[in-house]
Curated annotation (Swiss-Prot):
HAMAP family: UPF0597
GO biological process: L-cysteine catabolic process to pyruvate
Organism for this UniProt entry: Nitratidesulfovibrio vulgaris (strain ATCC 29579 / DSM 644 / CCUG 34227 / NCIMB 8303 / VKM B-1760 / Hildenborough) (Desulfovibrio vulgaris)
Protein name: UPF0597 protein DVU_0440
One MF annotation (Gene Ontology) recorded for this entry: L-cysteine desulfhydrase activity
Family: Belongs to the UPF0597 family.
Disulfide bonds: none
Domain of life: Bacteria
Pfam families: SDH_alpha
Length: 443
């Protein structure tokens, strides 16, 4: 597998939550094709995009939240050339104007079925024109640009860009076109076919360039964690846990550092994090526990980099089975599993012990639901980080899950398939109910 390609696409900096970032990106493209004052903006979102963008802070807005605000900001001042960083340079004057338009009822938002988990269609109307820009499959993948009924750009619509080849829901929807089923990127197809020993060996074989990039990403996320400790952003999960922990307690430090980083990100701080599998919180969960363990135990930079590589590879492996956005909390079961494996590497363990740690982590957190990106994600990230360390200790003692336990199997491939099916079939109804509870009807 091309490791450089994997890390270039799956592990990269992100500013703010990726769901409203994708909405703002699409809206900024629409604005380019729709001259004049905006009259209305209509959002058609997948269930996952709706819940993950509904209540998360947007950087540069003073703590304001939501997909609808992101859309208006993208229309008014978004820079489409910056992709998911389209709102990087907005100022408070633009934010105030956007809030005025929101208060006037300019933006509507609805959840649609029959679309990929990553799906947002932004329809902008201005004097005499209507433009619809759709992102689908990945947060930065523009599937179509339609101006006054004519397709003028985009990579084409897909029926199932998710890793498992399925859709969320069954009905067709507007404004989407007919979908066709493409393959996963080749590097993810290859990753899906690996066994755990191969993941372990790939992590051990990273070159010097990847080593430095992985360490840079960990340093980026640790800086965000320290921000959370100092200032008590968001729910203050990390800040509060740290205030009541012994400084020498590595388990507690792993929990509060990871929680603090998620606090900062969910509150909308203008500070980038290194993401994993398309998610900043996945990136925090996959890196901060490993980095804290490496720092606390004094291992070499090379060992830390290999542990980080393993964490990202395990995270990517599991997400390649489940898809980008799922009803199950990916920070817990995917990135948390990656962190467990990475910590085993830091502790000096072997591949068998690391795979056992992955199984133990998943046995602990398999059923954790994703009810959207928001401040309380700091609690889930802190929990996943703490459980990752506990699972790693079990693995190092040759304990934990060693035979099938419920739906969890010591073999990562078997458990990944079970996780994908549970997420796709078992939790589909739960996802739909959550959207109703969150007010996901058109408004």
């Amino acid at each position: 597998m091309d490791l450089a390609l994997f890390f270039r696409n799956e592990v990269k900096p992100a500013l703010g939550c990726t769901e409203p970032g994708a909405v703002a990106y699409a809206a900024s493209i629409a604005a380019r094709h729709c001259p004049g004052e905006p009259l209305s903006v209509a959002l058609s979102l997948s269930l996952s995009m709706f819940k993950n963008g509904r209540d998360v802070g947007i950087p540069g807005t003073g703590g304001l939240r939501g997909n609808r605000l992101a859309a208006v900001l993208g229309v008014l001042a978004g820079d489409a050339d910056k992709g998911l960083m389209a709102l990087e340079h907005i100022d408070m004057a633009v934010v105030e104007r956007a809030q005025t338009l929101l208060d006037a009822g300019m933006v509507t938002e609805e959840v649609v079925d029959g679309v990929p988990g990553v799906y947002a269609a932004v329809t902008l109307r201005c004097a005499g024109h209507e433009v619809t820009v759709t992102v689908a499959g990945r947060h930065d993948r523009v599937a179509s640009i339609v101006v006054d009924g004519e397709v003028v750009g985009g990579e084409g619509m897909e029926r199932a860009p998710e890793a498992d080849g399925t859709l969320h829901g069954g009905a067709s929807c507007e404004p989407s076109a007919s979908f066709t089923k493409p393959p996963l990127p080749a590097y993810l197809e290859e990753l899906r076919e690996c066994d755990f020993a191969q993941l372990w060996d790939m992590a051990a074989g990273i070159d010097a360039t990847l080593e430095q990039e992985l360490l840079r990403g960990a340093a980026m996320n640790m800086a965000v964690a320290r921000m959370g400790l100092e200032s008590g952003w968001g729910l203050g999960v990390g800040h509060t846990l740290a205030a009541h922990a012994e400084a020498a307690d590595l388990h507690a430090r792993i929990r509060f550092m990871a929680g603090a980083a998620a606090d900062v990100r969910m509150a909308g701080a203008p500070q980038p994090v290194m993401s994993s599998a398309g998610s900043g919180n996945h990136g925090i969960t996959a890196t901060v526990p490993v980095a804290v363990a490496a720092e606390g135990l004094g291992v070499s930079p090379r060992v830390q980099a290999e542990a980080l590589a393993l964490s990202h590879l395990v995270t990517g492996y599991l997400k390649a089975h489940t898809g980008r956005l799922t009803p199950i909390c990916g920070c817990s079961v995917a990135a948390g599993a990656g962190a467990a494996a990475g910590i085993v590497k830091v502790l000096g363990g072997n591949a068998v012990q690391a795979e056992r740690a992955v199984a133990s982590l998943m046995a602990s957190l398999m059923g954790m639901l994703c009810d959207g990106a928001k401040g309380s994600c700091g609690l889930k990230v802190a929990t996943a980080a703490g459980e990752a360390y506990a699972a790693a200790l079990l693995g190092m003692d040759d304990r934990g899950v060693q035979r099938p336990e419920g739906v969890v199997n010591p073999d990562i491939a078997t458990t990944a398939r079970a996780l994908a099916r549970l997420s796709r079939e078992g939790f589909a109804a739960a996802d739909a109910v959550m959207v109703e509870l969150l007010g996901g009807g058109k408004h």
